[in-house]
Amino acid sequence: MNRIVIALLKPFSFIPAILMMSMIFSFSSQNGTESSQRSEKEARGIFITIDHIMDRGWDDEKIQELADEYQYPVRKLAHMTEYCLLAICVSLPLYVYGLRGFALTFLAGILCVAFAASDEFHQTMVANRGPSVKDVGIDSIGVLFGITFVRLFCWIALGGNTKKRKRRRRRYYY
């Protein structure tokens, strides 16, 4: 009975990946002006938080100056983060289905990078936006971090190398 329930629930493990792809697609659907304003707002929020936590005493002019200066890195870091999360959301279901090692890295990487490339193509159809190979590269770095995180997390959760664990178990039976 338990195996039947697990088999029925396994396909639902892809829902977070589909939701993440939808979110990325919706961000890419924003025109260039909306996207820039959103990035500036987020950068401003980061510097307001830094000022509050570290008690820097920055006035609004200084915060705006820093937000303008760091808007581009904040935007690219957001790209990396969303693709890192996408890679996690894609890798975990593949892991659940039994993919491990290089096969997991390769398939999850191909799926996520292909989505990044298609997302850049989608931006050609949005006002004031354009494709960028550099963005696909930045997205790919996020994908690499996400897949590495899943592989390390699952390896640690399973207690390291499964071959050594199986050998250890056999010794106790003799």
Protein language model regions, located:
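"…centered on the first transmembrane helix and the immediately adjacent amphipathic helix/loop
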Residues: 2-82
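Membrane-interfacial, low-structure loops and terminal tails that flank and connect transmembrane helices
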Residues: 2-5, 158-174
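Membrane-helix interface segments
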Residues: 11, 99-106, 129-133
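Hydrophobic alpha-helical transmembrane segments
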Residues: 14, 105-110, 136-137
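Small-polar-interrupted transmembrane alpha-helices in polytopic inner-membrane proteins
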Residues: 19-24, 104-124
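Membrane-interface loop-to-helix entry segments
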Residues: 72-88, 133-141
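Membrane-interfacial alpha-helical segments at the cytosolic side of multi-pass membrane proteins
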Residues: 82-96, 141-157
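Interfacial helix-loop-helix junctions of multi-pass membrane proteins
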Residues: 116-138
